[in-house]
């Protein structure tokens, strides 16, 4: 739904789907164990770096959006922490975090501006039952978590559908005055395979 919306408006889109299960030719097809989470995170960060270095950064666009769903969002944040030069071109980071997915912080011991930039640039929809909301009942979460919005839903598909109009409105506001094909959007999400 989001990818088609972006393509229909002339965005240049890189849609990355990260499989939860990777099978090898010698595996029995009766059961495929979920890939090691750290290995998946590392591979996703590596792929994001490759795409940034070889495609996105080379483009003339200065309106770049990242959208991450589930664990893939955490991997995008890991990539951004290690590649601070991305901040110059990145206009908005949209994230969707389910109740079972950890929420990555964006804090640096050496860059005091980093968490402020992240708070201003991000919009993260967090599941209604995520542990973060219980932990921060009395005091709002700090800006190291980004600009958070509590979703009315826990199911990822329901969250994506419910927030579609709001997300596309945010992106429309960001692209005021742009030319078609000048706006790469990177969408990374987990898929069950």
Where are these regions (language model features)?
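Alpha/beta-hydrolase active-site loop
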Residues: 4, 8, 16-62
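Conserved beta-strand elements of beta-rich interaction domains across eukaryotes
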Residues: 20-21, 71, 99-101
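The feature captures the conserved acid-bearing segment of alpha/beta-hydrolase catalytic domains
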Residues: 83-192
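Hydrophobic/aromatic beta-strand patches that form the interior of the parallel beta-sheet core
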Residues: 12-17, 65, 92-94
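Active-site signature of alpha/beta-hydrolase-fold catalytic machinery across serine-
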Residues: 78-82
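Short, flexible/disordered secondary-structure transition segments
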Residues: 13, 59-62, 178-182
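Gly/Ala-rich beta-loop-alpha elbow adjacent to hydrolase catalytic centers
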Residues: 66-77
């Amino acid at each position: 739904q989001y990818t088609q919306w972006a393509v229909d408006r002339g965005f240049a889109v890189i849609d990355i789907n990260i499989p939860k299960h990777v099978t090898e030719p010698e595996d029995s097809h009766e059961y495929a164990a979920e890939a090691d989470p750290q290995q998946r995170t590392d591979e996703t960060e590596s792929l994001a770096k490759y795409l940034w270095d070889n495609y996105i950064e080379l483009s003339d666009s200065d309106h770049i959006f990242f959208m991450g769903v589930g664990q893939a969002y955490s991997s995008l944040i890991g990539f951004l922490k290690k590649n601070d030069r991305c901040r110059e071109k990145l206009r908005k980071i949209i994230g969707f975090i389910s109740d079972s997915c950890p929420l990555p912080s964006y804090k640096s011991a050496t860059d005091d501006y980093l968490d402020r930039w992240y708070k201003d640039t991000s919009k993260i929809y967090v599941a209604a039952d995520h542990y973060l909301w219980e932990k921060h009942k009395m005091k709002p979460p700090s800006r190291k978590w980004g600009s958070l919005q509590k979703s009315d839903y826990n199911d990822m598909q329901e969250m994506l559908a419910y927030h579609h109009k709001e997300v596309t409105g945010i992106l429309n506001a960001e692209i005021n005055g742009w030319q078609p094909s000048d706006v790469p959007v990177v969408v990374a999400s987990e898929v069950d395979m």
